[in-house]
Amino acid sequence: MEQRISIVTLGVRDLGAARAFYDALGWKIANEGEEAANIVAYDLHAMTLCLYLWDKLAGDAQVPPVGEGFRGVVLAYNVPGKEDVAPVLAEAEAAGGRIVKPAQDAFWGGHSGIFADPEGHLWEVAWNPFAPLGQRGEFQWKGCED
């Protein structure tokens, strides 16, 4: 198995509200029409983020659709500079997200904050001085070589 992720699918209870949030962040939907009524896809650099109804996603995975509170997953959005963290958090809040942890220096030497989207999915916005981003925003654990 190759070391990569193709799609991250987030289970949502309100597909319209979830789509409105990501649309408000300026993300462009990759699918339209009848297909987008059931699953919304956003093409990212080298992967896709999908939004799918919570119960349908659980049914497809053949697991019970239960779960509240921390789900054991935090998605990360890395930025090129320390000064970029707070504006991205503000953009998420303006789009309807909730700030969970304001921008602050992190124990590991970077700077980060966390917001929750309207469905409660956690997103860390981080600047990591030890892993500079590539020209297109690509992230690698030890930094991208351009």
Regions found by a protein language model. Give the residues of each.
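Conserved catalytic core of two-component sensor histidine kinases
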Residues: 9, 16, 86
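Conserved active-site tyrosine of GNAT-family acetyltransferases
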Residues: 18-22, 92, 120
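Vicinal oxygen chelate
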Residues: 1-6, 28-82, 86-116, 129-146
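Short, surface-exposed ligand-recognition loops at beta-strand->loop->(often short) alpha-helix junctions
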Residues: 10-13, 81
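Conserved beta-strand-loop-alpha-helix junction that forms the acyl-donor binding cleft
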Residues: 12-15, 106-108
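Amphipathic alpha-helical segments
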Residues: 14-29
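Short glycine-/small-residue motifs
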Residues: 124-125
